[in-house]
């Protein structure tokens, strides 16, 4: 076979999602990756999800993507992060068995309808009159209408460990230099980014008696709506910390770190700093937390999350053995930093197609993101849009009000200057685009596109029907304050009747109390009642948020006084303050387009200015 509608280059998280999504739309797809074992590879931490990231996993699943369902076949330690806060910012996360994940992904991709997998290296892309026509594999052309590049860290990748430099996309795998040259020749602006990984440790050499246990959730919450129950055995993780001796060794050897010797020019991820960065940027901290994460049920390898490093191997040995519980540990593989090319994502349409090259799409780390989840979110969008373009249909665009995927793509196409990672704080609409309602928001859109399986469609429609029926029912149940008092529950004695739906969202009520008042609710699915609880809890806030959105859009053009002291705005993060002070934007619109200045930060500035200049317009303040 040498002719396809869509060719996907790379078999990581972005590539697998892109290929599967395009295939679901019904076009002929080829996924080209170097080796079978590359499919679904997790080269960094053995975990999926988290704050913001977990939302993307749920959204990809809602579009009938792979990452959530595959993760549920390999999840060995589930944890709902931020559970003490509101449901809008809960972050579903799971430790993943690498071998199980890769096996499940391989089986899925190799048996996917409309999808052919080719194990080879793509040497070049053929472009005629600014239009993709083929990819070059082993000197031969494979013709196609659309190409999706999901190259990860392979574009001109260089591994750094101390003074050692190795040309590689990952340890032991060759980098791609031809594609970097091709992209440059096409006139695309490339930049250089960096990420890193910690040393891996033999679990049999760790003294767990000295460590703090970190159990997972008693009842795992699956990522996928298709998953009825997590069947994989669950295990514990452990926590330890660096100490002053650890920091002393690192400081004494900073000149040997590739990051601090000037050897690496690429920008590293702000939110996943190396241990060298941590002890410099946070020198006031006496220690830093390390999560010891198992890489699998049958693996002796531990991933020490929190100490990625580019220090020489001997320094890594000395450093790690100062840490409690790791005094006699054996290092299986040493940590390293990797530097790679990325394409400035401002050159992309929101469909993830390159503006200047018809039919060329980019997804994943090539766009400057970091993380499996961000890659998967871009991959599924690129795959859907490439397939729609083949069918000459309009692109599928998610905006900031639709999904975290929409927030991410909007942020990327407005420009970034450091590896991009998703957080809930990046969304000004996070109360409405929650993890729990991802399917309600996106699965109907996916059904309309024709990119969901019959199983997904049936599962969703059955759930939605039950949810709507239950919502109508709890909204029909009413009770007066006096009747509530007779049941033993106090509420404002204003004579106004409440519905069971409104009671679900009250701080001192919730499911159990409402069930006590209405025992007939015990026959309904508790998970559906939970969804209605979240809806009720945020109902009033969502109404107010509509006003915030109007205010936000109206006040984008307001001018900012040049003497404004950003330190006086307490809700701004240190990062945001630094960027505002550096850029000194003249208007709210200018501030909005500074990378890293979140929509919630913009709202905080507007409210601060409104308060400070309460009796006059802020538009003329200088």
UniProtKB/Swiss-Prot annotation:
Report a single Gene Ontology molecular function. flavin adenine dinucleotide binding
| Protein's cellular compartments | Cytoplasm
Q: Among the record's GO biological process terms, what is one? A: tRNA methylation
Where FAD binds, per the record, is at 10-15, 122, 176, 365
Query: What cystine linkages occur within this chain?
Result: none
User: Please, which domain of life does this record's source organism belong to?
Assistant: Bacteria
The family database entries (SUPFAM superfamilies) matched by this protein are listed as: FAD/NAD(P)-binding domain
Q: Supply the alphabetized keyword list.
A: Cytoplasm, FAD, Flavoprotein, NAD, tRNA processing
Q: What is its main location?
A: cytoplasm
> Which cofactors does this gene product need?
FAD
Q: Where does NAD(+) bind?
A: 268-282
Membrane spanning segments where?
none
GO CC annotation terms, alphabetical: cytosol
Assembly and partners are described as: Homodimer. Heterotetramer of two MnmE and two MnmG subunits.
Chain's role = NAD-binding protein involved in the addition of a carboxymethylaminomethyl (cmnm) group at the wobble position (U34) of certain tRNAs, forming tRNA-cmnm(5)s(2)U34.
Q: Which family, according to the similarity comment?
A: Belongs to the MnmG family.
Protein name in UniProt: tRNA uridine 5-carboxymethylaminomethyl modification enzyme MnmG
- Native species: Orientia tsutsugamushi (strain Ikeda)
Q: Which gene encodes it?
A: mnmG
């Amino acid at each position: 076979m040498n002719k396809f509608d869509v060719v996907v280059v790379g078999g990581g998280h972005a590539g697998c999602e892109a290929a599967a999504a395009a295939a679901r739309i019904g076009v002929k797809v080829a996924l080209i990756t170097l080796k079978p074992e590359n499919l679904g590879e997790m080269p960094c931490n053995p975990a999926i999800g988290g704050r913001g990231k977990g939302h993307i996993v749920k959204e990809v699943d809602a579009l009938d993507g792979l990452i959530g369902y595959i993760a549920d076949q390999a999840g060995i330690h589930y944890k709902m992060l931020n559970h003490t806060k509101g449901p809008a910012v809960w972050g579903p996360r799971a430790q993943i068995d690498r071998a199980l994940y890769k096996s499940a992904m391989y089986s899925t991709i190799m048996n996917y309808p409309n999808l052919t997998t080719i194990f080879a290296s793509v040497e070049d892309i053929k472009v005629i009159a600014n239009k993709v026509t083929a990819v070059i594999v082993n000197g031969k052309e494979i013709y196609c209408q659309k190409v999706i590049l999901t190259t990860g860290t392979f574009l001109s990748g260089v591994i750094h460990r101390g003074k050692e430099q190795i040309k590689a996309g990952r340890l032991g795998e060759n980098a791609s230099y031809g594609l970097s040259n091709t992209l440059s020749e096409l006139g695309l602006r490339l930049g250089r980014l960096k990420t890193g990984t910690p040393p891996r440790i033999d679990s049999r050499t760790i003294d767990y008696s000295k460590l703090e246990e970190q159990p997972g959730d008693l009842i795992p919450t699956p990522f996928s709506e298709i998953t009825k129950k997590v069947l994989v055995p669950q295990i514990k993780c452990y926590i330890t910390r660096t100490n002053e001796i650890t920091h002393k060794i690192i400081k004494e050897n900073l000149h040997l770190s590739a990051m601090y010797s000037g050897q690496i020019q690429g920008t590293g991820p702000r939110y996943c700093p190396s241990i060298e960065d941590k002890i410099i940027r946070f020198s006031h901290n006496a220690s830093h937390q390390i999560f010891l994460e198992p890489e699998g049920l049958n693996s002796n390898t531990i991933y020490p999350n929190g100490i990625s490093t580019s220090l020489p191997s001997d320094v890594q040995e000395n450093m790690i053995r100062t840490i409690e519980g790791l005094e006699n540990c054996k290092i299986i593989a040493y940590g390293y930093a990797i530097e790679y090319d990325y394409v400035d994502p401002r050159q992309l349409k929101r469909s993830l197609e390159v503006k200047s090259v018809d039919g060329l799409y980019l997804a994943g780390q090539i766009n400057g993101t970091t993380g499996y989840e961000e890659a998967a979110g871009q991959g599924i969008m690129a795959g859907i849009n490439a397939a729609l373009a083949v069918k000459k249909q309009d692109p599928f665009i998610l905006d900031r009000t639709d999904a975290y995927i929409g927030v991410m793509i909007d942020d990327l196409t407005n420009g970034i200057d450091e590896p991009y990672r998703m957080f809930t704080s990046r969304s000004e609409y996070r109360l409405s685009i929650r993890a729990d309602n991802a399917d309600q928001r996106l699965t109907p859109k996916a059904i309309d596109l024709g990119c969901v399986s019959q199983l997904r469609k049936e599962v969703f429609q059955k759930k939605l029907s039950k949810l709507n029926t239950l919502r109508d029912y709890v909204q029909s149940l009413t009770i007066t304050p006096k009747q509530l008092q007779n049941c033993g529950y106090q509420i404002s004695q204003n004579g106004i009747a409440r519905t069971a739906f409104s009671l679900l969202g009250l701080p001192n009520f919730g499911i159990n109390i409402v069930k006590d008042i209405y025992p007939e609710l015990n026959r309904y699915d508790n998970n559906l009642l939970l969804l209605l609880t979240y809806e009720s809890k945020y109902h009033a806030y969502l109404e107010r948020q509509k006003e915030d959105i109007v205010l936000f859009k109206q006040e984008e053009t307001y001018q900012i006084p040049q003497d404004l002291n950003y330190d006086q705005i307490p809700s701004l993060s240190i990062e945001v303050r630094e960027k505002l002070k550096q850029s000194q934007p003249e208007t709210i619109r200018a501030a909005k387009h500074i990378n890293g200045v979140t929509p919630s930060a913009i709202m905080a500035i507007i409210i601060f200015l409104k308060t400070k200049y309460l009796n006059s317009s802020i538009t003329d303040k200088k």
